[in-house]
Amino acid sequence: MRKERKKASVSLSPQTVFAIKTCIYLALACFSGLSLWSFQHNQPYTQNWIGLLGWSLSSFLLYNFGVAAFLIPLYFGFLSFLNMKKTPAPLAFRKAVAFGTVPVCCAILLSMVSPAQNLPQFLATRVPMVVMDLQPPKAYLGGIPFYLLYDGNSFSLKLLIGAVGTGLIFLAILLCAICYLIPKSFVLKKKALLDALLKFLKNKSYACWSACKKLLKNLVNNKSYCPEPSLRVPAPSSFAKKEVLKLPTPVISLPLENKDLHDGDSSNRTIFLSPPHPAKRTLAPQKKPDLPDLLQKRTSSTPIPSSSPSPFIVAGEAPDLPQYHLLSKRNIRRPESLLEELKKKAAILQQTLASFGIDASIGNICSGPTLAAFEVLPNTGVKVQKIKALENDIALNLQASSIRIIAPIPGKAAVGIEIPNPDPQPVNFRDLLEDYQKGTQRLQVPLLLGKKANGDNFWTDLATMPHLIIAGTTGSGKSVCINTIVMSLIMTSPPTDVKLVIVDPKKVELTGYSQLPHMLTPVITESKEAHSALIWLVREMELRYEILRFLGLRNIQSFNSRTRNVDIEASYDKEIPEKMPFIVGIIDELSDLLLSSSHDIETPIVRLAQMARAVGIHLILATQRPSRDVITGLIKANFPSRIAFKVANKVNSQIIIDEPGAENLMGNGDMLVVSPGSFAPLRVQGAYICDDDINKVIKDLCSRFPCKYVIPSFDTYDDSSSMDPESLDPLFNQAKTLVLQTGNASTTFLQRKLKIGYARAASIIDQLEEARIVGPSEGAKPRQILVQLSNQED
């Protein structure tokens, strides 16, 4: 048999092809660049660095492109760069065409310039000098062909679309080509700087517009407003001198108690006059209670401070609230490598799932202040529970301290995996407040809490929650969250709309808010005062319900928006206020209060949680120990909204948010928020505000609004009347007198003195303890007498 020789086919690898092209384009770039640089008209070709070939190539390029010929070496260098990066062929072709339009457009734009004279030495010896009916010869900056294309005899762009049209068209093509060639990373870097500049200009324009708007309001509402102290009257032409007529300055006598608001000469200040405020009518006489309630205290003799207009405020216009400019600003910059790092994490995540036999792809990638979230799209047949079981393995491969798996994401065919952000950034409270004040959305009782995992702002309305429980260990961000909530209320609502009752058993966290004009009473630090405050809130709730029932209204919103009927309201035995403010009760360290008097604290809390929503009374409870003896079944059932910071174990997480997950949080403001109607807890990074900003806001509010407590102190508040008189024993008052006179509060003592049985005497002792006349039982020790005889009726 004849053997046939097989010739081995020679084929080059793609890497070799790219390397050859790169070398060719780089050689052409160097060849053309050196020949153009060493070319001159008045020198022989022997002086050119590339010799005759270089001199001829330079003459050709300069004759056809003029000054734009110096872009040709850059064009070849760009082609070499594309091949060096192994750019795909379609993309490389588009970029090559885009770069090729640059010298063409430059040549046409340069041809629009008249043939130039007196060029620099470098250009005069290189640009073509041709005699075209011009004496002496002149240089054509864009080359002879492009000059003829622009301003030729038979056909020209100047004749077809004019000089302006030619310039606009080719300038637009040039800019489009340059924009297409600019790398995306460079655009993103400059975009951050441009966004910062635009935000600065927007803030300044907003401030200017607010000042102009306020000035226009002053001009409209005050007819006597005069922006200048004097008025110049033009004199007739016969007058030799012009006279200036000055308006007399009115002298206003201020009350003595308001003179401390002014310093310096008051005659130089502009004072807006308001019409006299009519005295508020007392609708019906009433008896003075032991301690006036919030609604009963609003009489003509003691009006709410903010209801009477200040002589320095335009009539009909409420004082402004503190703006976000008062808070400190932090510049937060994201590193450019964050997106690339998250893409690498996504690739590792997909490989990890594939190694465990889970076929899935990665969808959207969201990056927030401290979290990064990945959407995993499992293929058909993959069990979601199988992904959730790999939580520890995924955390190991991603090198994450902790992860959280949402399986599945509500409303999506995907599984969410949240990991710590490689470059965490704090959330500044000023940014939230700025976005809220500039936005159009307005909430009744706004809480600006922080930002979601995707970077969006998160705020909610306490009026719809309607009560809130906050739980977390020490250092998890619970106290900062409470400060953020208080700052949200006082910087978005005036004292006439929101009132606060704050209980702080630690005595150091929240006592600085005592001077706020929003406070009904100074910050409460004792458990006895806390119980009295809760009893007062229950009475206030009952009083508001009585008023709503009398007027036939359903809630506080309909009451505040009603049209007042003076005749009907005057027939009620108590004065009906014009407006009911929202009341927010904030209790920190609930577990400490429950340890001291569990039944006394829990009962009014449950009553308020069950009934107080419609009348605008809301509770916010905070605790470090979310155990079942603190968050009882009754409290948990009436608090549908909860915030869980990092807790100790899964049991505590199950108690606070009904599922595990809070034990894996990162701390420092990382929280899970459960709201009514939500399908799953929402991951939020809490906002941070420093103590200096809090002090500045409190000082600013105290200078704007007077602080007048409705209840100066709960130390002397008698809450025994909170018990139903019908449920008291007929011998209750007699037993109370005996106990206070003798100082003996024992069951056997009441049996002997009142000649009753043991069961009835023990019941009376329990009623005295509930009325906080005697203390709880201490075993063999006698009960403590909590009320002095001088404060009781004989």
Swiss-Prot record:
* Pfam families attached to this UniProt entry: FtsK_4TM, FtsK_alpha, FtsK_gamma, FtsK_SpoIIIE
Determine the domain of life of the protein's source.
Bacteria
Give positions of region: Disordered: 265-311
Give start-end positions of Low complexity composition bias: 299-311
Its cellular-component GO annotations read: plasma membrane
Q: Which UniProt keywords apply?
A: ATP-binding, Cell cycle, Cell division, Cell inner membrane, Cell membrane, Chromosome partition, DNA-binding, Membrane, Nucleotide-binding, Transmembrane, Transmembrane helix
Q: Which residues form the FtsK domain?
A: 455-654
Gene Ontology terms for molecular function: ATP binding; ATP hydrolysis activity; DNA binding
From its record, what is one biological process in GO terms?
A: cell division
Positions contributing to ATP binding? 475-480
Where do the TM regions start and end? Answer: 17-37, 59-79, 96-116, 129-149, 159-179
Cytoplasmic topological intervals: 180-794
Subcellular location per the Swiss-Prot or TrEMBL entry:
Cell inner membrane
Q: How does it sit in the membrane?
A: Multi-pass membrane protein
Q: What is known of its domains?
A: Consists of an N-terminal domain, which is sufficient for the localization to the septal ring and is required for cell division, followed by a linker domain, and a C-terminal domain, which forms the translocation motor involved in chromosome segregation. The C-terminal domain can be further subdivided into alpha, beta and gamma subdomains. The alpha and beta subdomains form the DNA pump, and the gamma subdomain is a regulatory subdomain.
Please describe the quaternary structure of this protein. Answer: Homohexamer. Forms a ring that surrounds DNA.
Chain's role = Essential cell division protein that coordinates cell division and chromosome segregation. The N-terminus is involved in assembly of the cell-division machinery. The C-terminus functions as a DNA motor that moves dsDNA in an ATP-dependent manner towards the dif recombination site, which is located within the replication terminus region. Required for activation of the Xer recombinase, allowing activation of chromosome unlinking by recombination.
Q: Which family would the database say this protein is a member of?
A: Belongs to the FtsK/SpoIIIE/SftA family.
Q: What is this protein called?
A: DNA translocase FtsK
Q: Which organism is it from?
A: Chlamydia muridarum (strain MoPn / Nigg)
Q: Which gene encodes it?
A: ftsK
